[in-house]
Amino acid sequence: MKIMKIAALGAVFAAQFTLAQFKQTPLPYAYNALEGSVDAQTMEIHYSKHGAAYAANLNKAIAGTPQEKQTLIQILSETSKLTPAVRNNAGGHYNHELFWTILTPEKNTQPSAKLAKAINETFGSLDAFKEKMSKAGADRFGSGWAWLSVDKNGKLFVSSTPNQDNPLMDIVEEKGTPILGIDVWEHAYYLKYQNKRADYLSAIWNVLNWKEVSKRYDEALSKK
């Protein structure tokens, strides 16, 4: 009987460990650190409610499945084979984890020389890129994301995806490694900007963490 109880207790601990596979990383700044572009209330709700829910619901969706032993990238790469719950929550968790890192209270960060060169060669100028990226977000009907990604040939491209899809998924038309993602779900901006998504997209550039985007660009190129 005692052995059975110990075994049962071990199973409980194992289940708890499995359900904690994917966790939010701590927010790298205070909720009010981006005021002027992203208000504190929006950031708190976005991170502590929406972001937390995607991680928790992803763990529930993969419980008892082979995806428990996979990395998030592996899960995203075979989205076409997975349930809507896994697709939506894996995408939501990945997208938000990226989103928190590409924002910063640090002022006037700039792309690295290598990334700036690639942006100029691809889009003509940094301002032209920002305009194209903002348009991708503004034109996304309903909820979704705008992306700057690196394709299989190491080239930059801008795209947008619906809901919580992203360019890592095998179901999207334009595939690549995201290095910058802008959330255009209403929960990302509605408390401050209401229906003025374009104003939100304009303001987000003021708190963009180009150091992080540049780092992700280098990492994406190193895997090509």
Task: Indicate residue ranges for each PLM-predicted region.
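Feature for soluble, non-membrane regions of globular proteins
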Residues: 20-224
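Bacterial Sec-dependent N-terminal signal peptides
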Residues: 1-21
